[in-house]
Amino acid sequence: MAKPVAASFLTQANALFKKNLTYQKRNIWSNVRLIVIPLYLCVVLVCIQAVFDSLVNNSVDNQCGCRCADDDKNGDGKCEIKSCGLQYSSQNQAVFCAFPNPPPLLPLLHIPPSVNRDSCQRTGSCPVTILVTGNNQSLGTTLSENLLSTSFTVNSSSDLFLRNLAYNVLSTTSETDYTNYRDPGIYSDLPIFNIQPQCTPATILSLSFRQPPLEFHKEVRCVQGLNLWRNNSLEVNDEIFKGFRKENHEEIINEVAAAYDLLNTDRNKFNVTIWYYTTYKGDLQDWRVKYVRVPRSVNMVSNAYLQFLRGPGTKILFDFVKEMPKQETRLRMDMASLIGPIFFTWVILLLFPVILTSLVYEKQQRLRIIMKMHGLGDAPYWMISYAYFLAISTLYIVCLMIFGSAIGLKFFRFNDYTIQFMFYFLYINLQISIAFLVSSAFSKAVTASVVAYIYVFGSGLLGAFLFQFLIESLSFPRRWIFVMELYPGFSLYRGLYEFSQYAFQRNLNGRDGMKWKDFRGSAMDEVFTIIIVEWVVALVATYYIDRVSSSSKDTFAFLKNPFKLSPTPQMLSFQKERSDVSVEMEKLDVIQEKETVKQLIFERSKNHGIVCDNLKKVYQGRDGNPPKLAVCGLSLAVPSGECFGMLGPNGAGKTSFINMMTGLVKPSSGSAFVQGLDICKDMDKVYISMGVCPQHDLLWETLTGKEHLLFYGRLKNLKGHDLNQAVEESLKSVNLFHGGVADIPAGKYSGGMKRRLSVAISLIGSPKVVYMDEPSTGLDPASRINLWTVIKRAKKHAAIILTTHSMEEAEFLCDRLGIFVDGRLQCIGNPKELKGRYGGSYVLTITTSPEHEKDVETLVQEVSSNARKIYHIAGTQKFEFPKEEVRISEVFQAVENAKRNFTVFAWGFADTTLEDVFIKVAKTGL
């Protein structure tokens, strides 16, 4: 027959694609449930929003205050007419009221409360400090004297009430709010302070003024302003920083009211720097900040400079500050924007456990390795698997965006859809790559699933309660934010956080959501860069690890080699001892097989499908245990057309040998060739001409028997009519064709049917080398005989290595047998040779009553004095006779004579069986 031709990349990819497509069609509802998960979660978010609206957004405290204007109730206690306005509102409610004509407010300066002024604590006098520095101390002193007014007189009934107040420097200890519709300095019970160079008791006044619809009565107290010169700005910075209540390490709080650096100001130019406390803006840095009372500081120093230039009569009066008109509003808190980062982090990361578990499941069930053994290359596997997960993930993300927008989530609707899609698309690629990368670290799907879900929920929680706090912290270094974003969960969270902030701003104040023009101004450019780089790195790392694991090398061998230690004395001694023992104990037939192997290697013969030369496998000892020598110097040559049977007790090394030959593990030493190809260097080429029937059936439960064979047939480069014919013949040969059995999912097959399908898979495409591990396990006698016939027919054009515990199967199928004990080949030959070599005796089995056991022993001794008892229980005895000492007729005659003296219930006389040979060799080799 022609040499098998390797399937091309496209052929392999097509085979896997069709198999996966069929598999996914059978699991369509699982895929649908996965894709519509975003819909369920978006509905949950809508429900949360509805609950929040009813409890918070629609609360009386979060809307303009009202009172009932209808005295005539309808008896149901409901108010028909309400009157709402500022006069009925609390401080919290006022911000929601309509302000068609916002009232003018006093431009107050913020001064520290008395508890934050060190002089109040030490001396009892409480001046407020104003710091001044600059290049010209003389000019600075002059301007300092012009900062404050020296008297306070005002007529509250005058039409120019605010203008009269503007001649004074009024201040308050109250911080501002997020708007200027109601200034806490005026609307609170706190007094207003007039800052003067000197205070007298007469400077304490009371004022009454109206800001429709409200009227205020405020007490105006005098507070001394202490102007202090400092040599440079460093001293000012140091004094402000150390005196602030939150940062002083000397426990001396001395905050200042204002601070100026006049720099190079002179009569020809006015150049000044003004200090103020940014802390009063609030904790959030991006979307909402409080006002700070800087305008009055600017006006003070400007007036001081004008008076320096033009005299004391020249001033720019700062009459009032005023907000823009606004309509009545209500609290608008969009939950999708508030909890969007953590919520959608969980939503998107939910794909990660699905991908990782799927990959690990294929590895755990050894589905990938069985595909590889039948010719599927790594590149087609990764490409098709990646494409499938990318398609599912993309559908998932698109559905998330569509569902979220359809039900009105502002998180999606307010931000540019192209930016969102690009971000999600890049991240799901990174997520798939990371799943491929970390799948190599797991061997069980359950463990992988648990770890993946910990990663999912842990990333969301850490992002919300740690990472977001650090993002919003003004003091946390930005470079460490970048380092934290290298963790994929945080890079996802940061991108979602940016979307939520832009959506929140749009909902709060009407500014645009995120657009491409905002890309560089936000953190998205940084996040995109991190995701793209990590995606590439993850793909490269995955490729490296997969190549290393495919060649059975240590993943981190390149790190260990420089420090690799020489074999330990224990290891060397162990190997030498075992080698010496094996040389002494090797039989002539085993030695002859070694000579044959050496001759074949020397001649570079390709007539033998399998050639193994001194193949060894040593497993390193653990926990102080010595190394385990699983296969000890095996030499074997199996020509095409031969079925070689491997017999041996459990743990003899048969499985280790098969694993080496199929590429699951790498030999510790020695070499092996399949069709002239070295299994250590050319395993990918070996797979082209190889078929494997594993001990445990490796099948897809939802694929039919026919679909299994179509897939593996395509991997063997069968196409069109040849493929269909090969599949049909394979199904017929193992009795899985008639009655529609071929179109039944393999999950519904019986154990025997699955076994027959596994054999058919191993033989499809006429492989040149086939490994079968107990192929007839679980079959009924009729099916077993039929399967043996199929295997016997297949060996005409292939070299087959078969392991079995059935002596009948070994005798029927195998041209030669090898018995393994303790990692060594004890004997080799065809069944008749082995029985002749290790048999040499007959076995008499006879059953009588227990009281006649001695009579039976006497009878046996009369026939052969060298006979020995090998079995005895409850009247049944077995005796072994040397063939050269007895004749069969003598035994028959002796038993017939014995029947006249006592009752013989049953008896039998047999030649040595293969099982007897196996037991004898196994006992001898142990």
Swiss-Prot record:
Where does this one sit in the cell? Answer: Membrane
Keywords for the protein's UniProt record, in alphabetical order: ATP-binding, Membrane, Nucleotide-binding, Transmembrane, Transmembrane helix, Transport
| Residues the entry annotates as binding ATP | G648, P649, N650, G651, A652, G653, K654, T655
> What residue ranges are annotated as transmembrane?
34-54, 336-356, 389-409, 418-438, 451-471, 525-545
Q: Does the record's keyword annotation contain Ribosomal protein?
A: no
Q: Which residues form the ABC transporter domain?
A: 610-847
* Organism superkingdom: Eukaryota
Q: Does the keyword Transmembrane helix apply?
A: yes
Write down the PROSITE patterns for this protein, in alphabetical order: ABC_TRANSPORTER_1, ABC_TRANSPORTER_2
- Gene Ontology molecular function, alphabetical: ABC-type transporter activity; ATP binding; ATP hydrolysis activity
Instruction: Name a Pfam family for this protein.
Output: ABC2_membrane_3
Q: Which InterPro entries match?
A: AAA+_ATPase, ABC2_TM, ABC_transporter-like_ATP-bd, ABC_transporter-like_CS, ABCA, P-loop_NTPase
Bilayer topology reads: Multi-pass membrane protein
Record GO cellular component, one term:
membrane
Q: What is its main location?
A: membrane
Q: Which family does it belong to?
A: Belongs to the ABC transporter superfamily. ABCA family. CPR flippase (TC 3.A.1.211) subfamily.
Q: What is this protein called?
A: ABC transporter A family member 6
What is the taxonomic lineage of the source species?
Eukaryota, Viridiplantae, Streptophyta, Embryophyta, Tracheophyta
